[in-house]
Regions:
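N-terminus-centric sequence/structural signature that marks the extreme N-terminus
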Residues: 1-153
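A short, hydrophobic C-terminal helix/tail in secreted or cell-surface proteins
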Residues: 154-158
């Protein structure tokens, strides 16, 4: 099983925090590891190879480099989704189900979830929109945990 981690926000020592997170999930992926750090997002990935062993390195990017994904799981119908996306003009570089998710996000945004069959958890950082989209499969076979802590004293001002 793979492992993903990350955070969004203006954080000092982003690299150190991401490294600690990656070390906590090292047992989830002996085959590969990758990180993404830019502006307000940091994503990490530990890989256990299942599909497309040669081309599944993550984080994975779209052609422009402004959409990035970390993904844990398997999309059972990725070939069907891929055919649909190719008909809409998307060009694929490899056969991984991860790349299929990037193109599905570009085409359908959150609506992509209704097209997916499988067990998965993923996080997509969209640099143009400055947004993080995270999802897991409908049955929770691949859990996805998130948390947020915000505090202030005294009250913030603009």
């Amino acid at each position: 099983m793979c492992g993903i981690c990350g955070f969004v926000g203006k954080v000092e020592d982003k690299s150190a925090i991401l490294e600690k997170m990656m070390n906590r999930i090292i047992h989830r992926g002996p085959d590969d590891a990758g990180t993404y750090e830019k502006k307000e997002a940091a994503l990490g990935f530990r890989r256990l190879s299942i599909i497309d062993l040669e081309n599944g390195h993550q984080p994975m990017f779209n052609e422009n480099g402004d959409v990035v994904i970390v993904f844990n799981g398997e999309i059972y119908n990725h070939r069907e989704v891929r055919r649909d996306l190719e008909e809409k003009g998307h060009i694929f570089k490899n056969a991984s189900d991860t790349e299929c998710l990037i193109h599905a996000y570009e085409e359908y945004k959150e609506g992509m979830l209704s097209r997916l069959r499988g067990m998965f958890g993923f996080a997509v950082w969209d640099e143009k929109e400055n947004t993080l989209f995270m999802a897991r499969d409908f049955f929770g076979i691949k859990p996805l945990y998130y948390s947020c802590l915000l505090y202030t004293s005294p009250s913030p001002r603009d």
